[in-house]
């Protein structure tokens, strides 16, 4: 099985090739140059500037207060040091409310160094994704638990159970057809995430979505066992405890994702 060379910078087309080759993708969030440099040098394939920074960096109770300016600042800091990992940046809450707003925010993020933008949800967002892709902006979709929908959802809850599973699969097909290059599946039962992964040609990146996704992502503070001021989800594992250092934890996480040992049943939702 051919795999992406460790020293070769990641590109958007290489992500789909990785899925075809059965190569697991390793993703982490980062918000500054120091952590990003360490992750980049120790096996991380994609780095996400997540609007999770609103909770773990800024101290908010949700991601809703994060602005485009916040995202641009952190994107610039991370982009300066990356040599290998592909850089993805979130469109924050409200920035993708219309095609024009999404385009403006996306251009700012790409000019700051991002190589892809992430959009939460389906529905009218499918047309937003298509609009951006038609304008040469790579997009990462995000389905399942979408933190920007926390008010509507009534909290951070598992998605895709029961009748909602079929809708999730349909949404995945829709965002893939619209041109999304990859998609994050968050807090989705393992069997449903496996069905989505089999239904689409683009790579799926799981976070609380079981081991059958094409890759995994964790929030920096969670995978290092740091206190972010919020309850730790079931799917989180403290890799610093076994890695002994940030670099060691990163290598341990990357190895566990690639060999399929993470996530195990303890760190996933069976139903």
UniProtKB/Swiss-Prot annotation:
The active site is at residue 186. Binds 1 Mg(2+) ion per subunit. It comes from Stenotrophomonas maltophilia (strain K279a). GO terms for cellular component: cytoplasm. The keyword rRNA-binding does not apply. It catalyses: 3-methyl-2-oxobutanoate + (6R)-5,10-methylene-5,6,7,8-tetrahydrofolate + H2O = 2-dehydropantoate + (6S)-5,6,7,8-tetrahydrofolate. 3-methyl-2-oxobutanoate binds at residues 51-52, 90, 118. Signal peptide: none annotated. Pathway: Cofactor biosynthesis; (R)-pantothenate biosynthesis; (R)-pantoate from 3-methyl-2-oxobutanoate: step 1/2. This is 3-methyl-2-oxobutanoate hydroxymethyltransferase. Its cofactor is Mg(2+). InterPro entries: Pantoate_hydroxy_MeTrfase, Pyrv/PenolPyrv_kinase-like_dom, Pyrv_kinase-like_dom_sf. Its EC number is 2.1.2.11.
């Amino acid at each position: 099985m051919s795999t992406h060379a460790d020293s070769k910078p990641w590109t958007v087309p290489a992500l789909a090739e990785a899925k075809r080759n059965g190569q697991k993708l390793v993703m982490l969030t980062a918000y500054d140059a120091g952590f990003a440099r360490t992750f980049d040098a120790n096996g991380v394939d994609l780095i996400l500037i997540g609007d999770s920074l609103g909770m773990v960096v800024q101290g908010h109770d949700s991601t809703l207060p994060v602005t485009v300016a916040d995202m641009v600042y952190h994107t610039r800091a991370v982009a300066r040091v990356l040599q290998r990992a592909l850089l993805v940046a979130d469109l924050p809450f409200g920035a993708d409310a219309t095609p024009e707003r999404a385009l403006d925010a996306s251009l700012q993020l790409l000019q700051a160094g991002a190589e892809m933008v992430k959009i939460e949800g389906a529905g009218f967002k499918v047309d937003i994704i298509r609009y951006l892709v038609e304008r040469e902006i790579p997009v990462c979709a995000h389905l399942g638990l979408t933190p920007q929908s926390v008010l509507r959802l009534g909290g951070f809850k598992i998605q895709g159970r029961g009748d909602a599973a079929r809708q999730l699969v349909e949404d995945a097909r829709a965002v893939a057809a619209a041109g999304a290059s990859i998609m994050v599946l968050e807090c989705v039962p393992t069997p449903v995430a496996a069905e989505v992964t089999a239904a689409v040609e683009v790579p799926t990146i799981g976070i609380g979505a079981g081991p059958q996704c094409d890759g995994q992502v964790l929030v920096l503070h969670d995978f290092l066992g740091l206190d972010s001021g919020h309850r730790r989800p079931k799917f989180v594992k403290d890799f610093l405890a076994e890695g002994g250092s940030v670099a060691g934890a990163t290598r341990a996480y990357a190895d566990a994702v690639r060999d399929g040992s993470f996530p195990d049943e303890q760190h996933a939702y069976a139903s």
